[in-house]
Design a protein with these regions (language model features):
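Short, conserved SAM-binding/catalytic segment
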Residues: 1
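A conserved structural/catalytic subdomain of Rossmann-like adenosyl-cofactor enzymes
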Residues: 5, 10-255
Protein backbone atom coordinates (compact mmCIF):
# COMPACT_ATOMS: atom_id res chain seq x y z
CA UNK A 1 0.00 0.00 0.00
CA UNK A 2 1.00 3.61 -0.53
CA UNK A 3 1.64 5.23 2.84
CA UNK A 4 2.56 8.90 3.15
CA UNK A 5 4.01 10.42 6.32
CA UNK A 6 2.39 13.83 6.25
CA UNK A 7 -0.23 16.07 7.83
CA UNK A 8 -3.51 15.37 6.05
CA UNK A 9 -4.93 18.72 7.13
CA UNK A 10 -2.41 20.93 5.31
CA UNK A 11 -3.94 20.69 1.83
CA UNK A 12 -6.90 22.79 0.71
CA UNK A 13 -9.90 20.44 0.77
CA UNK A 14 -11.45 22.21 -2.22
CA UNK A 15 -8.51 21.14 -4.39
CA UNK A 16 -9.10 17.40 -4.04
CA UNK A 17 -10.06 15.64 -7.27
CA UNK A 18 -11.80 12.30 -7.81
CA UNK A 19 -8.39 10.67 -7.98
CA UNK A 20 -7.75 11.74 -4.38
CA UNK A 21 -10.94 10.15 -3.05
CA UNK A 22 -11.65 6.77 -1.47
CA UNK A 23 -14.36 4.11 -1.67
CA UNK A 24 -14.07 3.31 2.04
CA UNK A 25 -12.85 5.43 4.95
CA UNK A 26 -12.30 3.83 8.37
CA UNK A 27 -10.82 6.28 10.83
CA UNK A 28 -10.21 6.98 14.48
CA UNK A 29 -8.91 10.55 14.06
CA UNK A 30 -6.94 12.28 16.81
CA UNK A 31 -9.12 14.28 19.15
CA UNK A 32 -8.37 16.73 21.91
CA UNK A 33 -5.87 18.67 19.80
CA UNK A 34 -6.11 22.25 18.55
CA UNK A 35 -5.04 23.43 15.11
CA UNK A 36 -3.48 26.78 14.22
CA UNK A 37 -4.85 29.35 11.79
CA UNK A 38 -2.61 28.24 8.90
CA UNK A 39 -4.15 24.75 9.06
CA UNK A 40 -7.72 26.01 9.41
CA UNK A 41 -7.27 28.18 6.32
CA UNK A 42 -7.42 25.04 4.16
CA UNK A 43 -11.11 24.55 5.03
CA UNK A 44 -14.32 26.42 4.10
CA UNK A 45 -14.76 29.47 6.32
CA UNK A 46 -17.88 28.18 8.09
CA UNK A 47 -16.14 24.92 9.06
CA UNK A 48 -12.79 26.22 10.33
CA UNK A 49 -12.83 24.56 13.71
CA UNK A 50 -9.83 24.62 16.03
CA UNK A 51 -10.52 21.02 17.06
CA UNK A 52 -8.59 18.38 15.16
CA UNK A 53 -11.44 15.84 15.17
CA UNK A 54 -13.81 18.36 13.55
CA UNK A 55 -11.36 19.11 10.74
CA UNK A 56 -10.85 15.42 10.04
CA UNK A 57 -14.62 15.00 9.72
CA UNK A 58 -14.63 17.75 7.10
CA UNK A 59 -11.63 16.18 5.35
CA UNK A 60 -13.36 12.79 5.19
CA UNK A 61 -16.46 14.34 3.62
CA UNK A 62 -14.33 15.90 0.89
CA UNK A 63 -12.37 12.70 0.22
CA UNK A 64 -15.16 10.11 0.14
CA UNK A 65 -16.11 8.96 -3.36
CA UNK A 66 -19.66 8.97 -4.60
CA UNK A 67 -21.30 5.77 -3.23
CA UNK A 68 -18.37 5.46 -0.81
CA UNK A 69 -18.82 4.33 2.79
CA UNK A 70 -17.32 5.67 6.01
CA UNK A 71 -17.12 4.67 9.67
CA UNK A 72 -15.53 7.31 11.89
CA UNK A 73 -14.93 7.42 15.64
CA UNK A 74 -15.65 10.82 17.17
CA UNK A 75 -15.71 12.12 20.76
CA UNK A 76 -18.94 13.01 22.55
CA UNK A 77 -18.13 16.68 22.07
CA UNK A 78 -18.81 16.37 18.35
CA UNK A 79 -22.30 15.03 19.03
CA UNK A 80 -23.51 17.69 21.44
CA UNK A 81 -21.32 20.58 20.25
CA UNK A 82 -23.55 23.60 19.57
CA UNK A 83 -21.12 26.22 18.28
CA UNK A 84 -21.71 27.52 14.75
CA UNK A 85 -18.78 25.59 13.30
CA UNK A 86 -19.91 22.21 14.61
CA UNK A 87 -23.48 22.87 13.52
CA UNK A 88 -22.21 23.71 10.01
CA UNK A 89 -20.18 20.48 9.84
CA UNK A 90 -23.07 18.32 11.05
CA UNK A 91 -25.51 20.08 8.74
CA UNK A 92 -23.24 19.33 5.76
CA UNK A 93 -23.11 15.71 6.90
CA UNK A 94 -26.91 15.48 6.82
CA UNK A 95 -27.30 17.44 3.58
CA UNK A 96 -24.60 15.78 1.48
CA UNK A 97 -24.34 12.30 3.03
CA UNK A 98 -26.59 9.56 4.33
CA UNK A 99 -25.80 9.45 8.05
CA UNK A 100 -27.67 6.23 8.76
CA UNK A 101 -26.25 5.05 12.11
CA UNK A 102 -24.58 6.35 15.26
CA UNK A 103 -23.27 3.86 17.84
CA UNK A 104 -22.70 5.20 21.37
CA UNK A 105 -19.67 3.48 22.93
CA UNK A 106 -18.90 2.96 26.63
CA UNK A 107 -16.71 5.69 28.11
CA UNK A 108 -13.82 3.40 29.08
CA UNK A 109 -13.59 1.56 25.76
CA UNK A 110 -10.09 2.89 25.02
CA UNK A 111 -8.84 2.69 28.62
CA UNK A 112 -6.16 3.14 29.85
CA UNK A 113 -5.13 5.33 26.91
CA UNK A 114 -8.05 7.76 27.15
CA UNK A 115 -11.23 8.10 29.17
CA UNK A 116 -12.93 10.31 26.57
CA UNK A 117 -16.36 8.94 25.61
CA UNK A 118 -16.57 8.09 21.91
CA UNK A 119 -19.04 7.12 19.20
CA UNK A 120 -19.00 5.59 15.72
CA UNK A 121 -20.62 7.49 12.86
CA UNK A 122 -21.61 5.38 9.84
CA UNK A 123 -22.44 7.27 6.66
CA UNK A 124 -22.44 6.84 2.89
CA UNK A 125 -21.93 9.27 0.05
CA UNK A 126 -25.40 8.49 -1.26
CA UNK A 127 -28.88 9.94 -1.00
CA UNK A 128 -31.28 7.85 1.04
CA UNK A 129 -34.54 6.97 -0.67
CA UNK A 130 -37.27 9.25 0.62
CA UNK A 131 -34.89 11.87 2.02
CA UNK A 132 -36.49 15.34 2.13
CA UNK A 133 -35.46 17.90 -0.47
CA UNK A 134 -32.06 19.40 0.27
CA UNK A 135 -30.88 16.45 2.36
CA UNK A 136 -29.25 13.09 1.67
CA UNK A 137 -30.14 11.67 5.09
CA UNK A 138 -33.71 10.52 5.66
CA UNK A 139 -33.28 9.13 9.18
CA UNK A 140 -30.54 8.18 11.61
CA UNK A 141 -30.55 5.19 13.93
CA UNK A 142 -28.93 5.55 17.35
CA UNK A 143 -27.81 2.53 19.39
CA UNK A 144 -26.14 2.53 22.80
CA UNK A 145 -23.68 -0.26 23.54
CA UNK A 146 -23.90 -0.80 27.29
CA UNK A 147 -21.14 -2.33 29.40
CA UNK A 148 -21.20 -6.15 29.28
CA UNK A 149 -22.44 -8.02 32.31
CA UNK A 150 -19.79 -8.35 34.98
CA UNK A 151 -17.90 -5.23 33.87
CA UNK A 152 -17.96 -1.86 35.60
CA UNK A 153 -15.46 -0.45 33.14
CA UNK A 154 -12.80 -1.58 30.67
CA UNK A 155 -9.12 -1.47 31.58
CA UNK A 156 -5.75 -2.67 30.34
CA UNK A 157 -6.29 -6.05 32.01
CA UNK A 158 -10.01 -6.22 31.17
CA UNK A 159 -10.09 -4.75 27.69
CA UNK A 160 -12.94 -4.87 25.23
CA UNK A 161 -13.26 -8.06 23.18
CA UNK A 162 -14.87 -8.73 19.82
CA UNK A 163 -17.76 -10.63 21.41
CA UNK A 164 -18.68 -7.52 23.38
CA UNK A 165 -19.87 -6.10 20.04
CA UNK A 166 -22.29 -8.99 19.47
CA UNK A 167 -25.29 -6.91 20.66
CA UNK A 168 -24.51 -4.38 17.92
CA UNK A 169 -24.31 -7.10 15.28
CA UNK A 170 -27.61 -8.64 16.37
CA UNK A 171 -29.38 -5.28 16.46
CA UNK A 172 -27.83 -4.11 13.17
CA UNK A 173 -29.55 -6.83 11.15
CA UNK A 174 -32.89 -6.50 12.96
CA UNK A 175 -33.23 -2.84 13.89
CA UNK A 176 -35.86 -1.90 16.40
CA UNK A 177 -36.32 0.82 18.95
CA UNK A 178 -35.42 -0.24 22.50
CA UNK A 179 -36.77 1.74 25.42
CA UNK A 180 -35.87 0.54 28.90
CA UNK A 181 -37.69 1.46 32.11
CA UNK A 182 -38.35 5.14 32.88
CA UNK A 183 -38.06 6.17 29.25
CA UNK A 184 -34.36 5.29 28.97
CA UNK A 185 -33.76 5.06 25.22
CA UNK A 186 -31.17 2.46 24.25
CA UNK A 187 -32.04 2.57 20.56
CA UNK A 188 -34.20 4.90 18.52
CA UNK A 189 -34.61 6.16 14.99
CA UNK A 190 -34.74 9.94 14.44
CA UNK A 191 -35.80 11.64 11.23
CA UNK A 192 -33.50 14.24 9.71
CA UNK A 193 -36.19 16.82 10.52
CA UNK A 194 -35.91 15.83 14.20
CA UNK A 195 -32.14 16.31 14.13
CA UNK A 196 -32.27 19.65 12.33
CA UNK A 197 -34.89 20.91 14.80
CA UNK A 198 -32.37 20.41 17.64
CA UNK A 199 -29.61 22.35 15.82
CA UNK A 200 -27.96 19.02 15.02
CA UNK A 201 -27.66 17.83 18.60
CA UNK A 202 -26.72 14.17 18.11
CA UNK A 203 -26.35 13.51 21.85
CA UNK A 204 -29.22 10.99 21.86
CA UNK A 205 -29.69 7.54 23.43
CA UNK A 206 -27.27 8.69 26.11
CA UNK A 207 -25.84 6.59 28.91
CA UNK A 208 -27.89 7.01 32.09
CA UNK A 209 -26.18 8.91 34.87
CA UNK A 210 -25.13 6.70 37.75
CA UNK A 211 -26.24 7.83 41.18
CA UNK A 212 -23.28 8.16 43.52
CA UNK A 213 -23.74 6.02 46.60
CA UNK A 214 -22.79 7.77 49.84
CA UNK A 215 -22.12 5.27 52.63
CA UNK A 216 -22.52 5.99 56.34
CA UNK A 217 -19.21 6.90 58.10
CA UNK A 218 -19.04 3.55 59.91
CA UNK A 219 -19.30 1.62 56.61
CA UNK A 220 -16.72 3.88 54.95
CA UNK A 221 -14.21 3.28 57.75
CA UNK A 222 -14.89 -0.46 57.78
CA UNK A 223 -14.31 -0.62 54.02
CA UNK A 224 -11.08 1.39 54.39
CA UNK A 225 -9.69 -0.91 57.12
CA UNK A 226 -10.61 -3.99 55.08
CA UNK A 227 -8.82 -2.73 51.98
CA UNK A 228 -5.80 -1.53 53.99
CA UNK A 229 -5.49 -4.95 55.64
CA UNK A 230 -5.55 -6.68 52.26
CA UNK A 231 -2.96 -4.24 50.89
CA UNK A 232 -0.68 -4.71 53.93
CA UNK A 233 -0.88 -8.46 53.42
CA UNK A 234 0.23 -8.13 49.78
CA UNK A 235 3.09 -5.81 50.79
CA UNK A 236 4.27 -8.26 53.47
CA UNK A 237 4.25 -11.12 50.94
CA UNK A 238 6.30 -9.08 48.47
CA UNK A 239 8.85 -8.01 51.11
CA UNK A 240 9.19 -11.60 52.33
CA UNK A 241 9.92 -12.76 48.78
CA UNK A 242 12.53 -10.03 48.33
CA UNK A 243 14.26 -11.09 51.58
CA UNK A 244 14.24 -14.72 50.44
CA UNK A 245 15.86 -13.82 47.12
CA UNK A 246 18.50 -11.63 48.80
CA UNK A 247 19.12 -14.19 51.55
CA UNK A 248 18.50 -11.74 54.37
CA UNK A 249 16.11 -11.56 57.29
CA UNK A 250 15.00 -8.21 58.66
CA UNK A 251 13.39 -8.31 62.09
CA UNK A 252 10.67 -5.70 61.79
CA UNK A 253 9.94 -5.79 65.53
CA UNK A 254 13.41 -4.41 66.26
CA UNK A 255 12.98 -1.37 63.99
Amino acid sequence: PLVYHDNSLTKDVLNYTDGDKFDVVLMNPPYGGNEKSDVKSHFPSDMRSSETADLFMVLIMYRLKRNGRAAVIVPDGFLFGADNTKIAIKTKLLRDFNLHTIIRLPGSIFAPYTSIATNILFFDNTCAEGAPEGYSTKETWFYRLDMPEGYKHFSKTKSMKSEHCDPIREWWNDRKEIIIADGDEKSRCYSVEDLIATDCNFDLCKFPKEDEEILPPAELLADYFKKRKALDHEIDKTLAEIQRILGINVNVDEL
